[in-house]
């Protein structure tokens, strides 16, 4: 008997991967956690049936959510990561020796423990000495922070269930307050392609652009995410991700990446016309 993982992207579109075996399943206090193994994508991790990470393509997402802000301001010292229980974002951040402190706020400890055991490729740096893991609601955590971080990365799930509060105006306002005077906020911005995800993308962008001086959106192709076309939000009090990119400074760090490079850094902000039109709809 064949076993397949299937995720519904719309009422008329489904995405499937043949599964070799199920490694782990748990219904935590917050969500259902599954870790499966496949021939094509290696091990992969889902929450409430939705794809989070695969061993084969996780490098794309984690490269883009980390190295774009870090190349924009290589002097970042203090970082807050909200979500990111699989550890991939933390892994990439720890490659920067200049970072002094990484606070990771994850609501579900079960996710972290499962990923440590079954996804060591992403979770390999969660116990690094600069990393402080707090098991708490990210919305609640940032309420009490002011001028504490140079970079906040919102590596959240989709805007429902446990991650719903991380897409509110209150949350983004608290992130702004928690950032230093030249702070940067980066978040996963959903997909612009299917209507449901596009609405979430536009809602998040509208809330963020009312707060920050600089607001940009950039993109990557992630094969296992809905439509494959995925966006990230870049918001900053000071730094422009293109004008302030110092190519030589970043290259001098000697960080070897699999997806990100400084040419791509500039190019990923060149959006398709249909996405630009969506982002401008609320301005008209």
Swiss-Prot record:
Species annotation: Clostridium botulinum (strain Alaska E43 / Type E3)
Family: Belongs to the spermidine/spermine synthase family.
GO molecular function: spermidine synthase activity
Reaction catalyzed: S-adenosyl 3-(methylsulfanyl)propylamine + putrescine = S-methyl-5'-thioadenosine + spermidine + H(+)
Quaternary structure, from the entry: Homodimer or homotetramer.
Matching Pfam families: Spermine_synt_N, Spermine_synth
Name the record gives this protein: Polyamine aminopropyltransferase
Domain of life where this protein originates: Bacteria
UniProt-annotated binding residues for spermidine: 62, 86, 155-158
InterPro entries, per the entry: PABS (IPR030374), SAM-dependent_MTases_sf (IPR029063), Spermi_synthase (IPR001045), Spermidine_synt_N (IPR035246), Spermidine_synt_N_sf (IPR037163)
């Amino acid at each position: 008997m064949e076993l397949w993982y299937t995720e519904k992207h719309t009422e008329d579109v489904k995405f499937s991967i043949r599964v070799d075996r199920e490694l782990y399943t748990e219904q935590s206090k917050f969500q259902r956690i599954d870790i499966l193994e496949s021939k094509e994508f290696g091990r992969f991790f889902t929450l409430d049936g939705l794809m989070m990470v695969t061993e084969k393509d996780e490098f794309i997402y984690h490269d883009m959510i980390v190295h774009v802000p870090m190349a924009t301001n290589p002097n970042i010292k203090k970082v807050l990561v909200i979500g990111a229980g699989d550890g991939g974002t933390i892994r990439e951040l720890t490659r920067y020796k200049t970072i002094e402190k990484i606070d990771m706020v994850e609501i579900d400890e079960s996710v972290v423990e499962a990923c440590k055991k079954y996804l060591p490729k992403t979770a390999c740096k969660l116990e690094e000495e600069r990393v402080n893991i707090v098991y708490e609601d990210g919305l609640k955590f940032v309420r009490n922070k002011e001028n504490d971080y140079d970079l906040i990365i919102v590596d959240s799930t989709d805007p429902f269930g446990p991650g719903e509060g991380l897409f509110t105006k209150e949350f983004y306002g608290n992130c702004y307050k928690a950032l230093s005077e030249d702070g940067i906020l980066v978040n996963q911005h959903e997909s612009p392609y299917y209507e449901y995800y596009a609405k979430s993308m536009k809602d998040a962008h509208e809330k963020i652009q009312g707060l920050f001086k600089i607001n940009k959106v950039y993109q990557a192709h992630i094969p296992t995410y809905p439509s494959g076309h995925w966006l990230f939000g870049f918001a900053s009090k000071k730094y422009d991700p293109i004008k302030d990119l110092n190519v030589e400074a970043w290259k001098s760090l000697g960080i070897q990446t699999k997806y990100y490079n400084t040419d791509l850094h500039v190019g990923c902000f060149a959006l398709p016309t249909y996405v630009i039109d969506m982002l401008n709809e609320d301005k008209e």
